[in-house]
Amino acid sequence: MCAPVVWRTEAMPSVSDVWGYRAVAALAVLALTAVCLGRRLPRLHWADGVALFWWVCVSLNYVFVSPYPAAEVYGKAMALGVAYVALRLVIPFCGRAFTRLWWVGLCAAGGYELWTGFMQLAGREASRHHLFDVTGTFFNPGPYAIFVAVVLAVSVAWWYRHGEAFAGRGRWIRVGAWSVAAVAVFCFPVLVATWSRTAWVAVAVAAACLLWKAHRRMVLWGMGVAVCAGVAAYFLKQGSADGRLLMTMVAGRAWAGEWLCGHGLGGYAQAYGAAQEAFFAVRSGSPLSVVAGSPEYAFNGVLGVGVEQGVLGAVPALVLGLWSLVVLCRRGEVSAYGWLVLLVSALFSYPFALCPFLSLAVAWVALAVSLEAGAAEVRWWKRMAVWPVVAVGGWCVWNLSDNTARCVEAYEEFRRVRGVQDVAFLEDYRKKYEDLKAYPDFLFTFGTALREAGRYNESNAMLRQGTRVSCDPVFYTLMGNNYRDLGAVAEAESAYRKAFGMLPGRMYPLYRLMKLYEAEGQMRKAEEMARQIIAFRPKVDSPAVREMKNEAKKLTKR
């Protein structure tokens, strides 16, 4: 379950997704082996019922609620369900050895990520993002810092609990113990290099929980220092903090709109865009418009589940997450502190939007349930009854890995030609549509290529599909341009206004409106837009912004 972490993780179809599915399929084979070789099966627990209820709700949501291209999202849910069942069979067979293998695997994966990070900082390997020096195998430093924080918490907790006992044993045991200590030490400079406040907050919470019983006074002093540091960090990056606050408020508003069943799997982006438009519609001139954006992910895991799945998904997620954390902490599992770091990080970031972190989450929940439920001897025919379920699940997940590998290949081919606007590539885009129809950058590029070819209606159809999987108003702006060239002035005006309403911090839709009114001879409206552009305070000044303002000033002086 740690293997997907060390593979390349992207914001689009990635190798880590492929290997994540294959790891689950391999886990299913191990589960079948455990059923054959062992005489015991895990006892059922009420948490198994909660997990089953959640999986059924997700399946019904996908079939009856979601109008979005959510096959990939549901595929992940199915793979996670198979992984949970397989782990519930494997963990009792392995016994206490599994817990040791689990934290050792986390530390080993963390060691690889640390090595990659140091190589990037030293310039020996390329970072995965052009704006940041260190990203590990991830596409930006945010999720990378979260995983490093998870490993830091686990390694420090192990050394704090067991390090001294192991340091005096045989040579290889001492080597292992000091290797864990080295992993913990090297996590610190990497975390500093990522500049991730979320990771540091999560580590601080885990440290407070680890030290609370023995060093309560020190923890209280540390909490005071942390509050002061938090205030300083807020003013240091106030815009980013205000942006997270806005995303939380808007996501909460989106959830409230469909509180029971949610908007459907894969529907977070469109629901967020509509909620943000409604938010600013009643708060014209709000200072938060400057920090508004178009997030691809929910920066709060609970709200993300709530928006897509409603209460029927959010409640099981909270119950399983918090209950498993309590169980692991009560039983003294050192990996529990890594689970705590991941849960805290999910309140401010998007780890659960990525396959590697979902794999880790399922493993922690399955471990907690297995420790609580125990196992019992059963007759051979009961053990064999488990075979078809696990075998079919493993086969389905392996097929998912093949489909995902095809999507990865299609996206790589698309990325190689995306900068070339040529009619000759339209047929290639059309062939890749079924594999990439859930990815906004592909849909926008396809829509732009169709527009360049003069096929405005087809372009709008593709861009309209993009609005279902993205909350970026650029889709509406380009649709407005298509409507304008088709002579549909009212539709163009509506598209431009919607683009500005979704993101009032961008001036370009106002500029397009001004040019539309000017071309149609509606000079009063054009001058009104021009005055609005002149008074507009952009978040970032640029030559393009200054040019649009100059055109607006010229129009008002006519």
Regions flagged by a language model, labelled:
Residues 1-63, 67-72, 78-108, 158-181, ...:
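Transmembrane signal-anchor hairpin modules in multi-pass inner-membrane enzymes, especially those
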Residues 4-6, 22-34, 52-64, 72-89, ...:
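Alpha-helical transmembrane segments of multi-pass inner-membrane proteins
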Residues 125-132, 265-308:
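Interfacial juxtamembrane loops and adjacent helix segments
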Residues 426-430, 463, 496, 530:
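Hydrophobic/aromatic packing residues within the alpha-helices of TPR/SEL1-like helical repeat arrays
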Residues 435, 468-469, 502, 536:
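Structural marker of alpha-solenoid helical repeat scaffolds
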Residues 441-445, 474-478, 507-512, 542-547:
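Alpha-solenoid helical repeat scaffolds
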Residues 452, 485, 519-520, 554:
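Register position in tetratricopeptide repeats
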